[in-house]
Amino acid sequence: GYIKLNGRCYLGHFNLKVMSSGYIRVVNEVPLAHYLYGVVGHEMSNTFPIEALKAQAVAAKCYVLSNMTTSGDYYIGDTSAEQVYKGYNASYTNVIEAVDSTLDEILAVNGRMLCTYYAASNGGETLLPSQAWPSKRLSDGGYDIRLDPYDLGNAYSKMETVKLPVNMGGEISPALMNMLLDKASRALGYQVNQIDGIYSVSVHSPKYSGTSRCMSKCSIELAASQNGMGSERVTLEFYTSEFESYGVVYDKTLRAYWGEMDSSGYYKIYHVRFGHGVGMSQRGAQAMGSAGMSYREILKFYYPGASFASIDVSAPQDPINKNSGVEFTPSGSFVEAVTTGGVKLRSGAGTKYSSICTVPAGSTVYVYG
């Protein structure tokens, strides 16, 4: 069976601890498969292609098994800081199939399980762990820098585009015009109010060695004047992050810039990368699955230095069978009770605290002193 907590269904057992603040910490203990049911369906969506869901199931499994800690009250958190976990949804049949069919599969490098980082969208190019988190001194084994046309081609990948007409007339957004006029005035040493032409644009200076789609600087050669009189050419160079400062782009969750000339005569600067960009792009995997690629092809693309391996893990129990799940053996000093009716579990010790769930009748509750 399951218990409802904050509107979501959770399988397994709950360990509760009253914190010094008076609030209760709730820890859900479940078998690996049931944990993955609650991750895959929320890190992706049950509507994603089944092969993308299988790739997510393998990646999420390797990540949790590589990052569990035994030093605290729980093994891993349930937010996007680690992996999103939101319990069990019986209607997520694609998710359940993806988890069950790949349960014993992992990725390994030199005989050791790979910590499989992944994120929503890389913006068209992957990064290495050592580049994303230099202070952690992580190994790059299993990873590579590569262009990702699948992420880039997915219409659901987050992107903002800045357009500049080069050697032709064309529209410039008000925010970009304000930025160019301000920077041209500063460079020329007097106020200008008109852009008379843009002659070249480039986004350059890779933020990370070996990358081509994460640039830190932009150079623009243009002509500017005061009401068209005495037009002067000037080359502006500035950090790409300044597009945000001037309100040319708005999305603070995006982390990378790169650019290219298109066939219509516009230079386009792309503001991309929703997430760290290391390992699997979930939007890229979605596009690859839609194109008919298998989960193994998806994983090999994003973790090219890894090999498939297997682990010995128990088959998933039937979530509906009340006798299935994790066997729980209490320890320490406790009082055992069986609920005869629904019992409200509150966020703190006392009726003044809000109810977060109702423990069903017939549940075994252990209260520790």
Task: Describe each model-derived feature in a short phrase.
Residues 1-369:
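Conserved, single-site charged/polar hotspot
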